[in-house]
UniProtKB/Swiss-Prot annotation:
Protein name: Protein ARMCX6
Function text: May regulate the dynamics and distribution of mitochondria in neural cells.
Pfam families from the UniProt entry: Arm_2
Keyword Transmembrane helix: yes
Positions of the UniProt region annotated as Mitochondrion outer membrane (MOM)-targeting sequence: 1-6, 26-36
InterPro entries in the cross-refs: ARM-rpt_dom, Armcx_regulator
Family: Belongs to the eutherian X-chromosome-specific Armcx family.
One GO term describing the cellular component: mitochondrion
Source organism, top-level taxon: Eukaryota
Residues in the Mitochondrial intermembrane compartment per record: 1-7
Residue ranges of the TM segments: 8-25
Region (Disordered): 70-105
Organism whose genome encodes this protein: Rattus norvegicus
Length: 301
């Protein structure tokens, strides 16, 4: 009986010892496995960081590319060049900012044709000696810059440079095209000041090219358009250098008279024109033989 009890206690002790040893073994092995898992996770993290650094050099946010530029030409939304954008990284990790590089052409340019580049267009006209080619280019140049600029602004940029560079040219067709390009040169005082620099050439074209009625019409059209906000035409008609009605051709006389008769609709210009020049113009037409028909044609509605 006593012997059996001793054997029972010995078996229980062995089982308890074996269990304790097994627990110590599991704790030791589990700690090693945990360290290995942590090392593997750290290696994976380092690999992902290396991949993210390489990816940042070539990664583009295509949705941000489709967004419009702001008014000042800056990218002020996520995905801007030189900026950052948050996006989910792989493996459910925390959000990290990924820098993006400057977008290549054409995204880095808002306007293909700018004011600076368009001002080089008259250089091409100077290299072309053919009168027909020059006139053709002048006629079409105002619509070329419309790709990036408004139509009116582009016409001003082209017409002002053309009036200055082409008026002294000997070809009447080229001068006619140069004077005929401006549609609304009165949009700014700067534009008018630039045209005033070449107003003498315009007046000479309208007066002394007696056999070139179309050139005279173009010159008169430019002068009349300048009277919208100032009295340039009134001063030009009163100037001795602009004796259109006394020395111009028949067509030019009629047009000059019509221009003077339309000026009284602008009260600011009426007094200066009607004071002397208008009366002198009527007297010239009445006293010369063959001029009364021109007067009737000019005053008829």
């Amino acid at each position: 009986m006593g012997r059996a009890r001793e054997m029972g206690w010995m078996a229980a002790g062995l089982m308890i010892g074996a269990g304790a040893c097994y627990c110590m073994y599991k704790l030791t092995m589990g700690r090693d496995e945990g360290n290995e898992l942590e090392n593997e996770e750290e290696d994976e993290w380092d690999d992902e960081q290396d991949l993210d650094e390489e990816e940042a050099d070539i990664w583009f946010d295509f949705t941000a590319m489709a967004r419009p530029w702001s008014e000042d030409g800056e990218w002020d939304e996520p995905g801007a060049p030189g900026g950052t954008e948050d996006r989910r990284s792989g493996g459910g990790k925390a959000n990290r900012a990924h820098p993006t590089k400057q977008r290549p052409f054409p995204y880095e340019h808002k306007n293909i044709w700018g004011v600076q580049s368009f001002q080089t267009f008259p250089c091409a006209l100077n290299l072309t000696k053919c009168a027909f080619s020059q006139g053709k280019k002048m006629f079409t140049e105002s619509t070329i810059a419309g790709f990036s600029l408004t139509h009116n602004v582009s016409r001003h940029l082209s017409s002002l440079s053309v009036v200055g560079s082409r008026s002294p040219t000997p070809q009447p067709t080229v001068r006619e095209k140069a004077l005929d390009v401006p549609e609304h040169p009165n949009s700014s005082i700067e534009n008018q000041d630039q045209i005033k620099m070449y107003i003498d050439e315009v007046c000479r074209d309208a007066v002394f090219c007696c056999c070139k009625s179309f050139l005279q019409q173009a010159g008169l059209g430019l002068l009349i358009s300048m009277t919208v906000i100032n009295n340039m035409l009134a001063k030009s008609l009163s100037d001795p250098k602009f004796p259109l009605l006394s020395e111009g051709s028949g067509c030019a006389k009629v047009q000059g008279l019509e221009a003077q008769m339309s000026l009284p609709e602008k009260p600011v210009l009426a007094e200066e024109v009607l004071a002397a020049q208008m009366l002198f113009s009527f007297m010239c037409l009445f006293t010369r033989s063959g001029s009364r028909e021109m007067l009737v044609e000019a005053i008829s509605p």
